[in-house]
Regions:
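Beta-propeller and closely related beta-pinwheel folds
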Residues: 9-175
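Beta-sheet repeat architectures centered on beta-propellers
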Residues: 121-136, 142-352
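Surface-exposed flexible segments
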Residues: 5-10, 46-63, 107-109, 192-210, ...
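Elongated alpha-helical scaffolds
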Residues: 1-2
């Protein structure tokens, strides 16, 4: 049901049902700039039709019956079995069913809105798993991330396996997306496979086109705007200011980045590494871990170098291996760092 609340009556006045509106619907929204209240997955007067879109007459939420003198109407979508989500976008409203994506655009009399299917097999995973950011809409699907900026395509991701191989889709309705506009980021919170509550996040940076992952319990989020900092709430209702300090409520915020494995001569030769040249802008200190292995299926050997700071010019090492990766990690309070180019002094060490 759809309700209205008149603020002029004060906070003690209860919201009242709009009895002329569909008696059941999946969700509703107001379109702009044409100002129509729209019900998605609406009751048609006889039954609840989860693929039906209905709208009232312009600026009159009590008038839902189409006539020659109003702009009320309806449209039954095809492609799917139920409407999952809807969102205002640039000059249109995007509608996701459980399989497809549709565009709803205001075209004026006599039809009021025009509808077009813009994609198939691109469903959104939940009703809150999308965001609109600078004219672009991105969302989490069932096996991919998607982007729509006038054309629909898969958003390339380096963390697809990490996310979608360990996700609890039974609790998909709890998945939600938010923005961190200050850093050009969109973040999704979701349940890992072993959890029934939100316990992980995945973040995408639009400018740097970089993905990050982590663990955090946030069931709701609002970006900075009226509030000075982004605010998130956990499952217990505790609110947190985010992006305020480099710590996690006074405790060190553990962070790391790890490279893929590198080799030389297409893996035919061993490497002998003699020096790491750090390239950091930072405060605090961090650790470098060099992981090597002699054969692709062999166990990695880790060599740790601690206490790296912005004044560390080089780290002398003597490490051999056929494949190598480097991990950079911080676990101290007030630590803030950015990493530049990876520089290793490497020379071939034979074909063993």
């Amino acid at each position: 049901k759809i309700y209205t609340w008149d603020a002029s009556g004060g906070v003690n006045v209860r919201a009242t049902e709009i009895t002329q509106a569909p008696s059941a619907n999946n969700l509703c929204a107001v379109t702009v700039p044409d100002r129509h209240l729209v019900a998605f997955g609406a009751h048609d007067g006889t039954q609840h039709d989860t693929m039906l879109v209905k709208w009232c007459s312009q600026e009159d939420y009590t008038d839902w019956t189409p006539t020659a003198t109003n702009t009320a109407g309806s449209q039954l979508l095809s492609g799917g079995s139920t409407i999952i989500a809807a969102s205002r976008s640039e000059g249109q409203t995007l509608i996701w069913t459980d399989t497809d994506l549709h565009s709803m655009q205001y075209i004026g009399p006599p039809y009021t809105f025009g509808f077009q299917q813009v994609g198939s097999n691109c469903a959104v995973v939940s009703s809150r798993a999308f965001v609109n950011f600078n004219g672009v809409t991105v969302w989490m699907g069932l096996r991919n991330f998607w982007i729509y900026d006038g054309s629909l395509r898969v958003l390339p991701s380096t963390v697809n396996a990490y996310v979608f191989d360990d996700i609890n889709l039974t609790n998909a309705p709890k998945i939600h997306a938010a923005t961190i506009a200050e850093y050009n980021e969109v973040i999704w919170f979701y349940c890992s496979a072993a959890s029934t509550e939100v316990d992980r996040y995945v973040t995408y940076n639009f400018v740097e086109q970089v993905w990050t992952v982590g663990t955090m319990d946030r069931t709701s989020w609002v970006d900075r705007g009226v509030l000075k900092y982004p605010v998130g709430f956990d499952g217990n209702g505790q609110g947190y200011n985010h992006e305020k300090t480099h710590n996690a409520d006074g405790v060190a915020m553990v962070a790391h980045v790890e490279s893929g494995e590198l080799d030389i001569a297409e893996g035919d030769s061993l490497m002998f590494m003699t020096r790491i040249i750090p390239d950091f802008t930072m405060q605090g200190s961090l650790d470098l871990t060099l992981k090597t292995r002699k054969y692709p299926n062999a166990t990695q050997t880790a060599t740790v170098f601690t206490g790296i700071t912005s004044s560390t010019e080089k780290v002398d090492i003597r490490v051999r291996g056929r494949q190598a990766s480097i991990r950079i990690e911080s676990n101290t309070t007030d630590c803030d760092w950015r990493y530049g180019a990876l520089r290793l002094d490497i020379k071939p060490d034979g074909r063993q």
